[in-house]
From Swiss-Prot:
EC number: 4.1.1.39
Binding-site residues for substrate, renumbered to this chain: 125, 175, 179, 296, 328, 380
Cofactor: Mg(2+)
Protein name (record): Ribulose bisphosphate carboxylase large chain 1
Keyword Magnesium recorded: yes
Subunit-level organization: Heterohexadecamer of 8 large chains and 8 small chains.
Family of this protein: Belongs to the RuBisCO large chain family. Type I subfamily.
Naturally occurring in which organism (per UniProt): Cereibacter sphaeroides (strain ATCC 17025 / ATH 2.4.3)
Lineage per the UniProt record: Bacteria, Pseudomonadati, Pseudomonadota, Alphaproteobacteria, Rhodobacterales
Gene that encodes the chain: cbbL1
Amino acid sequence: MDTKNTEIKGKERYKAGVLKYAQMGYWDGDYQPKDTDVLALFRITPQEGVDPIEAAAAVAGESSTATWTVVWTDRLTACDSYRAKAYKVEPVPGTPGQYFCYVAYDLILFEEGSIANLTASIIGNVFSFKPLKAARLEDMRFPVAYVKTYKGPPTGIIVERERLDKFGKPLLGATTKPKLGLSGKNYGRVVYEGLKGGLDFMKDDENINSQPFMHWRDRFLYVMEAVNLASAQTGEVKGHYLNITAGTMEEMYRRAEFAKSLGSVIVMVDLIIGYTAIQSISEWCRQNDMILHMHRAGHGTYTRQKNHGISFRVIAKWLRLAGVDHLHCGTAVGKLEGDPPTVQGYYNVCREPFNTVDLQRGLFFEQDWADLKKVMPVASGGIHAGQMHQLLSLFGDDVVLQFGGGTIGHPMGIQAGATANRVALEAMVLARNEGRNIDVEGPEILRAAAKWCKPLEAALDTWGNITFNYTSTDTSDFVPTPSVSM
């Protein structure tokens, strides 16, 4: 019998000094995961000569209780329960040398309601492990008992729609451009023009905080003046994502309180502030009836490459637990990374009460969200009115469609850019509701609407043929991944 991956127990274990991870009990090919286990799927690339099962056991060990040698203090713990267990290893289809490694963790290993603690175990150490050329966390499954220790989004999609009194169609937004350099007064003018033209939201970008050209307080004052004026003139509830990201939590709370005092309904933070800060701001938003918008700034440094890092679907799961109301999830048709099925998988993580296994969309596990509120996905980055049929078909109603350059760059002005997007959306939703095939008839529907809307006509003439047809880096490993054609 081959014993190289068989656990060594008893006194022989503690005489051994250094054992293989599989021999220390971190591999169990017969293990059946429990409903209460936290499950993780890693993509691993072992060094030449390293047994994939041993590599998988090492991942389980180094993300739970192991160190490089046997330690007698294991005997002071319930080590059989505390050890994570790699229980399945499969070759990655079409990628020699890479393996999918499934690992189960007993729920007792994790602090309740703490993304910081969860990530310290799952990704804290294993990604630097020498026997692995590369490792990537592809997906996770959280038991209901663990999900219930989190409060989730402070507002959720249903309550947000009730506050806006907007139902049955996507929300519209735009990012103020240029990102940097505008004075507070000019910034507020851009916000007013976009909202007056028909958008629901305008937003700060990820790197606009409090720079010499525009102090944060000036921005907040001019922006909220614009929001209130546009709301009064249109009769619609409007908002602007005020970015409160700062160098300390104390300063972030100070900015959040000022935004609230001005009547803002929403604040924004960047992913780079960290999970503890995100959970803290989420709790503040919950206590103060504020919507929390999350910009995923920095995620591409570790989510884009298929062989090493963390899939964005995992980040989306962590952020739903941590408690954000909006999350940038990609566009599939815009300028940023993401093929259609993969991006749809991110949206499913945000919006569904229960995720089923869907390998085409990168979902390897079922996930019961235990009535945790839903996150509103945001599609932003290189999109324009000419793609409205694709965006509506891909993502449905519960999404914020943000046209930054596609609003601010309109040849007839900002307000005209907003109007073009609003008319394009209304025309496409109407056509869909009438039973028309918007995938096929989309361009025709837009051109018909443009006959009665000069701003839309100008938008289609300016950007109608603009596409970003590049091969996605992060794609499904199980099915062909089609591109979206205009």
